[in-house]
Regions:
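Sequence/fold signature of self-assembling virion shell proteins
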Residues: 2-31, 36-50, 54-56, 71-79, ...
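Long, hydrophobic/aromatic-enriched structural stretches that serve as scaffold segments
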Residues: 66-116
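Extended, solvent-exposed, turn-rich assembly/linker loops in the middle of proteins
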Residues: 130-197
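Hydrophobic alpha-helical segments and helix pairs
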Residues: 97-148
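Short, glycine/acidic-enriched capping/hinge loops at junctions between secondary-structure elements
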Residues: 57-63
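Charged, low-complexity surface segments at secondary-structure and domain boundaries
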Residues: 1-4, 89-93, 131-139
Length: 293
């Protein structure tokens, strides 16, 4: 791989970030990248962790009570670590190869990588979050959806989950049922959330199985895990989770150097972390369908 290869394809690689943001339904939960760094080996995240004690009595003689408020960094290994190799046949010039790579990688992100990433994140938050309701909601009855959403917000209010940082993820039929009511109650409940995002059902399940991309699972991707059920809505407080992702095309082999054949090879690596802070599990509320026999 030459430095010129990487330099030439850099514009296409940088555009992948925009493709991700536009295609992902969970990109709005991404943490502040300025607060996260990678370790020297580039394989682990350094995540900011806040620890704080409550106020104590100030004493005129002894001064401030012991304890305090601190920001430290905890090293975390990624729980998302996936990869693929893109192959582009040799073309007349490098410009054509760049356009082909841009189209290929963009389509791959939109149709393969992002749906898997969304599904993995939402399933992880469902598993680790505290709030759960297992009840199949009638898609033709908006009132039952409003009631379930109202009960969820009350639970989160009582758990002191920040009210201005709650993001609602909901199925299309669920949101349609609520909107079709056109009542004060239906409008009021949706106004409780920082934003409302429709999630396609294949990405919205309680657990996923990630396929290896090898042997009998050579197609890769993800599937609904055995025993998993469909999610109907999920409320997530941004402050309750740690979510960061890196996608890197960190290696390119041109047709001249490629010993496998007369084509370009682009090595794509997607890794990241999606976790729930141990002391903020009440910041996740998931409503899922009842299991069917």
């Amino acid at each position: 791989m030459s430095a010129n290869d990487i330099k030439f394809f850099t514009p296409q690689i940088q555009l992948l970030d925009e493709v991700y943001k536009n295609a992902s339904v969970t990109a709005n939960l991404d943490g502040n990248s300025a607060l996260v760094s990678m370790t020297a080996n580039g394989n682990e995240f350094q995540i900011p962790v806040m620890d704080m004690d409550g106020l104590g009595e100030y004493n005129r003689k002894t001064g401030y009570p012991e304890g305090g408020v601190s920001l430290t960094f905890e090293t975390k290994k990624p729980n998302i670590d996936r990869a693929r190799v893109f192959i582009v046949e040799k073309m007349d010039n490098q410009e054509s190869a760049g356009l082909a790579f841009g189209a290929l990688s963009g389509e791959f992100l939109r149709t393969k990588a992002v749906p898997e990433l969304d599904a993995t994140r939402l399933a992880t938050y469902c598993t680790k979050g505290k709030g759960k309701l297992t009840k199949t909601l009638d898609p033709n009855d908006g009132a039952v959806w409003v009631k379930a959403l109202s009960n969820a917000t009350v639970d989160m209010d009582n758990a002191e989950v920040p009210q201005n940082d709650r993001h609602l993820f909901i199925t299309s039929d669920g949101l349609t049922a609520v909107n079709n009511m056109q009542t004060i109650e239906s409008r009021a409940i949706l106004a409780r959330f920082a934003d409302v995002t429709i999630v396609p059902q294949p990405r919205f399940v309680s657990a996923v199985k990630l396929l290896s991309g090898r042997d009998t699972e050579d197609k890769g991707g993800f599937a609904k895990a055995d025993g998993a059920t469909d999610l109907q809505f999920q409320i997530i407080s941004g402050s309750a989770i740690m979510q960061w992702t890196k996608d890197i095309v960190n290696k390119i082999i041109n047709p001249v150097e490629n010993q496998d054949g007369d084509w370009w090879k682009f090595f794509f690596h997607l890794y990241g972390i999606c976790e729930v802070y141990d002391n903020k599990v009440s910041g996740i509320y998931s409503c899922m369908k009842e299991a069917t026999a």
